[in-house]
Each structure stands twice: as C-alpha cells, then as structure tokens.
C-alpha cells in the first residue's frame, strides 16, 4: 500500500481550461507523507484543488504535470516550492486518463552519503 511508503505520493486530476491548458489540479489520493510535506491533513487535501489550498501557486508545477497527463511523459523536477517553503524533487508520470502520479521528496531532509 502507498500509505506505508517513506516518501510522499499523490495522484492528481488535472483541471484544464477551454484551450486545454492546465489551470489547477485536484488531489485524488495522497499518503500520510504527502500530508506531512504539504503541512495539511489528508482530509483537507483530498478532493480539493491545489489553488484553493495554496493561493501562491507556482505555474511551473502545472506545466510539468500537464505534460505528463497530455503527452504521457515521465518528468523529474528539482525546484523550490514557495507554497510550502521547501526544495523538492518530484517525479511525475501518467496514471489514469486526466491524472498523473507524483513522488515527492523534500531534498533538504535527505541525508547524502559521501563515499571516501
């Protein structure tokens, strides 16, 4: 089950405008690590749009998730998320029609091992 994974996972449904451009997404599934990362309980996330929860939504996430949904691309992003004040590594990929799955890591929490 995704609930036991040690990293954040979500399945989102993209919301498009008339020109087929992504304008938001709705959280359809999230595991407990996602709630910790987003700093919101799952019952506030699931069924709600990202834009309704985070007024400072950065469109860079939309463009990447849009590509995964519309073109079936698997993408990896490493960028700062002003919404939750964290540096993230995100892997997104198509799941169901209109949806994409995302694996998220807060890279500031990752301990890197140096080989000597």
What kind of feature is each model-predicted range?
Residues 1-18, 113-116:
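PAS/LOV and related PAS-like sensory modules
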Residues 15-18, 79-86, 88-96, 103:
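PAS-family sensory domains
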Residues 17-22, 34-45:
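PAS/PAS-like sensory domain cap-loop motif
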Residues 27-34:
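N-terminal capping loop/helix in small sensory signaling domains highlighted by a polar->aromatic N-x2-3-F motif
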Residues 37, 44-46, 50-53, 68:
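Alpha-helical sensory/transduction surfaces in regulatory modules that relay environmental signals to outputs
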Residues 53-80:
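Terminal output helix/cap of sensory domains in signal transduction proteins
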Residues 98-116:
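Sensory coupling linkers of modular signal transduction proteins
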